[in-house]
């Protein structure tokens, strides 16, 4: 972006001009007054007729000069004030247009080369800067919508087989974020689950996130086991990673016919699992492995468990447990578990929305600097292709 030269408006020069005009006008009046007094003194000292007549003429001429000076001064002052008033009104209208978001196409033009024209230049520079920020904001809003469109929503969740229920939520800390979640049917009997967190925020992280999501889904769609998927994705992300991003991730595959779940993780927080309706949640601990895009050729260990009907798995990114309040305290994994246990019987979507409300209440309005993503799946049992 081209750097613009900032202009400094010298308001003091306006005051100086007024003072100069005032002293010039005052000086002329003093000179004329002194001349009149001198003539009068001479007339008193020499009361001759011719001297008195000359004095009268001189006084009349001096008085006329004073009147002319005053008239011209007021005319000049009126024209000066009128020019400033018109220019200031134009500036006011121009700034009101900018303030309403309707940026004028043409720059503000005020001729004269004085402080008013300098002020107009400053306003034009401000308009260009605001236009650029507004353009960037609009582009980020479009990027946010595109990113949201890449993630499966309620419609995708309703299309899943009756043997499972899924709810998810993502709230980026900036306009676009580096978190991702995904759920999809690998085939009629197998459900794929993904949650991941890129090591940065904003547009670059969002682009890296999109690449990560595509690589994971493409490999899982081929029926590749989760551990091998992470290995392939890790090597792929390392091929062109000049920014030095890394990704924490958890991916799983559930056989909806029998509840068998294979999963692997890459440095991600442990999920919570609930075995049976009304049961307490416990961390689903496993080998955390290395983050993605961390080291080439790393082999990711895969874990397996069997889910029974009514079992749930709750996945999240560290934007949940590391959310902070006004005293700089963390929400923490303990509060996450407490909320899950207290709402063990609630619908997955209600658990997700309620957890978000609990975090917002805890933060008490403090701005959060990390993306927040959650995903919950409940295995209902039965055939995957019902």
Predicted regions mapped to residue ranges:
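Flexible, glycine-biased helix-capping/connector loops in cytosolic signal-transduction modules
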Residues: 94, 98-104, 189, 296
């Amino acid at each position: 972006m081209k750097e613009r030269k900032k202009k400094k408006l010298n308001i003091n020069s306006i005051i100086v001009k007024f003072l100069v005009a005032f002293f010039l006008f005052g000086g002329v009046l003093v000179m004329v007054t002194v001349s009149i007094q001198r003539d009068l003194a001479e007339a008193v000292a020499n009361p001759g007729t011719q001297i008195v007549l000359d004095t009268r003429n001189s006084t009349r001429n001096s008085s006329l000069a004073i009147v002319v000076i005053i008239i011209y001064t007021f005319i000049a002052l009126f024209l000066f004030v009128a020019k400033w008033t018109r220019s200031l009104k134009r500036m006011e209208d121009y700034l009101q247009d900018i303030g309403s978001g309707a940026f004028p196409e043409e720059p503000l033009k005020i001729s004269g080369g004085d402080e008013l024209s300098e002020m107009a230049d400053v306003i034009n520079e401000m308009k260009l800067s605001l236009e650029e920020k507004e353009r960037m904001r609009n582009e980020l809003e479009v990027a946010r919508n595109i990113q949201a469109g890449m993630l499966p929503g309620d419609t995708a969740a309703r299309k899943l087989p009756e043997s499972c229920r899924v709810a998810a939520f993502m709230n980026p800390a900036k306009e676009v974020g580096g978190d991702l979640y995904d759920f999809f049917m690998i085939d009629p009997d197998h459900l794929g689950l993904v949650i991941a967190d890129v090591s940065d925020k904003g547009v670059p992280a969002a682009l890296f996130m999109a690449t990560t999501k595509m690589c994971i889904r493409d490999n899982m769609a081929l029926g590749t086991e989760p551990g091998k998927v992470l290995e392939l994705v890790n090597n792929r992300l390392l091929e062109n990673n000049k920014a030095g991003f890394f990704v924490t991730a958890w991916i799983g595959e559930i056989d909806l016919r029998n509840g068998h779940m294979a999963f692997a993780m890459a440095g991600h927080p442990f999920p919570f699992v609930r075995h049976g309706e009304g049961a307490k949640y416990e961390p689903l601990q496993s080998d955390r492995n290395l983050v993605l895009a961390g080291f080439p050729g790393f082999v990711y260990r895969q874990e397996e468990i069997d889910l029974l009907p009514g079992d749930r798995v709750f996945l999240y990114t560290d934007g949940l447990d590391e959310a902070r309040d006004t005293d700089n305290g963390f929400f923490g994994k303990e509060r996450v578990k407490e909320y899950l246990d207290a709402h063990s019987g609630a619908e997955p979507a209600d658990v997700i929305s309620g957890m978000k409300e609990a975090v917002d209440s805890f933060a008490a309005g403090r701005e959060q600097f990390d993306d927040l993503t959650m995903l919950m799946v409940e295995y209902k049992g039965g055939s995957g292709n019902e």
